[in-house]
Curated annotation (Swiss-Prot):
It is found in: Cytoplasm. Residues 3-201 form the DPCK domain. ATP binds at residues 11-16. This is Dephospho-CoA kinase. It comes from Burkholderia lata (strain ATCC 17760 / DSM 23089 / LMG 22485 / NCIMB 9086 / R18194 / 383).
């Protein structure tokens, strides 16, 4: 099936844009949602996470203690690689399954770290980047998550640069001070293009 890889930095509006495509019939496969599912109580990744990191990283309800894990992997690259070695194969298997079962005319992989992960770029026929200025990202995440400016800047520093994302893009949606109608118009135009690409690829 024809596949779009949708990405963007934290606070760019990826989820909003993905939902607009979903409302138009695209089949969404969201790696963040899958990551949350496999680290929820009884999730597929939890036994291996507990074995690798200890019971202290499991919350009382049996889910991953996200705040504790976030603190660890932010300062420990080896711990991040250990976590990714557990979660990435499971996320890959789940995304493959969801893509195979997708009923829509095309599938849209929603992948925050698509540019940083070469295999996601290879799995997508086109890469769509949701773009906005860094200052807009910072303001949105501070407002949405209650993070300090320093916390948001640290997250952004761990992600691909805005320039690297734009260089990887086949298509770009600008979501800065865009009105909802203007954003929807950008989505409508690309959705029609993607329907054409998907039909030609069948």
């Amino acid at each position: 099936m024809f596949a779009i890889g949708l990405t963007g930095g934290i606070g760019s509006g990826k989820t909003t844009v993905a939902d607009l495509f979903g409302a138009r019939g695209a089949s969404l496969v969201d790696t963040d949602l899958i990551a949350h599912r496999i680290t929820a109580p009884g999730g597929l990744a939890m036994p291996a996470i507990e074995q690798a990191f200890g019971r202290g990283f499991v919350a009382a309800d049996g889910s991953l203690d996200r705040a504790k894990m976030r603190t660890l992997i932010f300062s420990d690259d080896a711990a991040l690689r250990r976590l990714e070695a557990i979660t990435h194969p499971l996320i890959r298997a789940e995304t493959d399954r969801e893509a195979r079962e997708a009923p829509g005319p095309y599938v849209m992989f929603v992948v925050p770290l698509l540019v940083e992960s070469g295999n996601w770029k290879a799995r997508s026929d086109r890469v769509l980047v949701v773009d906005c200025p860094v200052e807009t990202q910072i303001a949105r995440v501070m407002r949405r998550n209650g993070f300090t400016r320093e916390q948001v800047e640290a997250i952004i520093a761990k992600q691909a640069t805005r320039e690297a994302r734009l260089a990887a893009a086949d298509d770009v949606i600008v979501n800065d001070a865009t009105t909802p109608d203007a954003l929807a118009a950008q989505v409508d135009a690309l959705h029609q293009r993607y329907l054409g690409f998907a039909a030609a690829a069948r």
